[in-house]
């Protein structure tokens, strides 16, 4: 009876969603709605930073290590130890606090093997870290950890724990089935890119808005994305200065043309009067400048010059005749 009660306690302890609690406490977010939508330490580190991720990793490991350590202190049965470890793992995978959903049980796996087989766990952990460092895929490193664990247990002489390690390997592979599919298709993102995308989450969310603003440059924003008539270009609603000037000139052109036609008609109607008026003034000046001046300038000077020449000639001839008679 006491053993069953302890298994229930181990399950409840494993069900505590430290990742969800810390994410809401330190960064006000729900890891189930961001990143990989998982409450595990890896996703919490993406969303809230490395410190919160490490804190989640430690607590998830402790909720597996503490129940197993207590089981070791109260019983020598390897079966009981293994069942306690499985209860804590199932609590993390299918949490009673999260509608029987949970994480991927990697940190809790580390916790349950920590008091059971320390050195095999260390060797498996080194292999895990080496794979993560070389490939950048945390999921691949986690799969390496649980795959290497049975072999390390055999090498370390912990053959009684091999069945537990095999069951844990199946559970962890099942929880990583989506990651395995992405790895096989080459679609899994390495840790560095995931961490960068999570850190730039705000900018990535603003990028589409900036693109939408750039796409709607020169438009009127109605506050919606409906593509309604309010998103017509502002050039249609408010014409530019050039178009307004062109329209103003276009409106003035017919008026100027009409005024030009009126002026031409008036000039055409007044043409006979203008010609008659011009002919009369021309006759009078012509009579004055041609008739009278011509008679004065021609007749009078001619008579004067003729009189002078005639008088001089008569005087000369009279003088000559006087001289001849005197002789």
Curated annotation (Swiss-Prot):
Which ranges does the record mark as transmembrane?
A: 3-23, 52-72, 78-98, 112-132, 152-172
Q: Which GO terms describe its biological process?
A: phospholipid biosynthetic process
The reaction(s) catalysed by this protein are: an acyl phosphate + sn-glycerol 3-phosphate = a 1-acyl-sn-glycero-3-phosphate + phosphate
| Compositionally biased spans, kind Basic and acidic residues | 259-271
Protein's membrane topology:
Multi-pass membrane protein
Keyword set, alphabetical order: Cell inner membrane, Cell membrane, Lipid biosynthesis, Lipid metabolism, Membrane, Phospholipid biosynthesis, Phospholipid metabolism, Transferase, Transmembrane, Transmembrane helix
What are the boundaries of the region Disordered?
184-212, 233-327
Q: Which NCBIfam families match?
A: glycerol-3-phosphate 1-O-acyltransferase PlsY (TIGR00023)
Name under which the protein is recorded: Glycerol-3-phosphate acyltransferase
């Amino acid at each position: 009876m006491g053993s069953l009660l302890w298994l229930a306690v181990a399950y409840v302890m494993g069900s505590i969603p430290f990742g969800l609690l810390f994410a809401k406490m330190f960064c006000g977010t729900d890891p189930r709605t961001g990143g990989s939508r998982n409450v595990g330490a890896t996703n919490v580190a993406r969303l809230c930073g490395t410190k919160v991720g490490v804190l989640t990793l430690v607590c998830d490991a402790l909720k597996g290590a503490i129940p197993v350590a207590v089981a070791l202190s109260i019983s020598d049965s390897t079966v009981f130890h293994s069942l306690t470890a499985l209860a804590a793992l199932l609590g993390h995978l299918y949490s009673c606090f999260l509608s029987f959903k949970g994480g991927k049980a990697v940190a809790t796996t580390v916790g349950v093997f920590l008091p059971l087989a320390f050195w095999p766990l260390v060797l498996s952990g080194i292999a895990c870290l080496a794979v993560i460092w070389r490939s950048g895929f945390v999921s691949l490193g986690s799969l390496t950890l649980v795959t290497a664990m049975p072999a390390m247990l055999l090498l370390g002489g912990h053959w009684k724990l091999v069945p537990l390690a095999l069951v844990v390997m199946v559970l962890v592979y099942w929880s990583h089935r989506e990651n395995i599919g992405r790895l096989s298709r080459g679609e899994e993102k390495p840790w560095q890119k995931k961490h960068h995308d999570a850190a730039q989450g705000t900018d990535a969310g603003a990028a589409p808005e900036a693109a939408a603003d750039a796409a709607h440059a020169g438009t009127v924003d109605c506050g919606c994305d409906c593509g309604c008539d309010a998103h017509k270009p502002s050039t249609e609603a408010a014409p530019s200065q050039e178009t307004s000037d062109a329209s103003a000139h276009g409106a003035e052109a017919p008026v100027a043309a009409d005024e030009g036609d009126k002026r031409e008609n008036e000039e055409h109607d007044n043409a006979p009067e203008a010609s008659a008026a011009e002919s009369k003034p021309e006759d009078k000046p012509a009579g004055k400048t041609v008739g009278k001046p011509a008679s004065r300038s021609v007749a009078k000077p001619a008579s004067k010059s003729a009189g002078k020449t005639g008088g001089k000639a008569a005087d000369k001839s009279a003088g000559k005749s006087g001289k001849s008679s005197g002789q």
